[in-house]
Amino acid sequence: MKKRAFLLTSLSLIFTLGLNLISPAQARTLIPTDFRFFGSGYGHGVGMSQIGARGQALESKTAVEILNYYYPGTAVTAYPDDQLIRVNIANLISSVTLNAVGSTGEIRLYQGDIPMSESPEPFGIYSGDTTALFTNFAGSVVPALSSPTAKYAAINPAPAWTVRWDSATTTALLTNGVMATQYKYGQIVFKSVTNLLSSYLAVTNTLRLHDEYLYGLGEVPSSWPAAALEAQAIAARTYAIGKLSRLRVECDCNIYNTTVDQNFVGYAKETEAIYGIKWREAVNRTFVDENSALVVTLEGKPIQAFYFSSSGGVTQNVVEVWGSPVPYLTGVPDPWSLNPTINRRYALWSRFVPQSVMAQAFLLPDVVSFTINSRTQTGSISSITGISSTGASATLTGELFRAKVKLPSTWIHNTRAIVKLPFIAKECQVEIIERAKYCLT
């Protein structure tokens, strides 16, 4: 403690001497090289806190109790969920490859976007050692087949191609750049999507929502307590049902496989060592029968079941984040998110944001300082203004600022800028926020 105090005193003296060499006008226009932010939580903060669900499960709460807590006024009831859901698994790309995995694996190729209910004659059936490369070209998709044991003729392009396989013996391995993902269920469609500027390849996996889709969700660790896994499965099913009514043209999908919607990782979730079976069993426990399962409802209809990783201690009132009131998204205490034992990474975090990123976020030539204009009732920032050395300024909502500078959340407690000066490496601006004092050394 004495050594640290001496170091801080020395740094303060050096910093004061350094400033004496700089005129007041120069000091006022110093442009920070970085900004440091301290905060808590991860995600938008609306709906169910996943860390909170884990914390409550550790306190022996049931899945229904957890869901009723985070979505007050709702009920967990049986609801039909035997629909097919179309999941975008690769988008805005030019090409992708597919292989069959399995000792007796084979793939069946169909020309066109074939509905799951139809079983036409395939364009071709190919052995498991065949690699199929699908390339977008001028608004069409061109398949090219290769194999160490066979030669294939060129195939004419078509707007879309469908691939199926026998899920009892085979999985489909999709390779997009360096990312390779296995899919066990349903079918995969490769389609060319055209917008005003160009065309690109969109790849989708169509499968049953009830079980096949949920088995592949990688939203939380499978090692978590059973009640937390069940709550996650029910919330995810509810969210997905809300996406079924619209096919999005830009992705040829109902839902994305990323955290834009829900993190769908395919067969890898089920095959996790030791714990994969726990997630599958948790999903199964939420079934009511073959064609229906537990869903969060209000007046008999599925809710918008938003969820996120962790909060700054209280979940958000949705009206303060996205502008429209929702009766079951009004915010509740979430102390589990601030427990570092169960939220090691985000109970308290710090991030450096480079000057270039701050300037780009505010669309200013540079940022010398910023002002937090307002906060939500939970303490997260709702409005922030960046100020340039030119005197220009720009204002962003808290959520937009978080997205642009890639901070974990809008629960920002403390900030400081780092300025490179002659004789000193760092400037430390000390702020006391909620009795927390942070300083660089």
Residue locations for each model-derived region?
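Conserved, single-site charged/polar hotspot
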Residues: 2-441
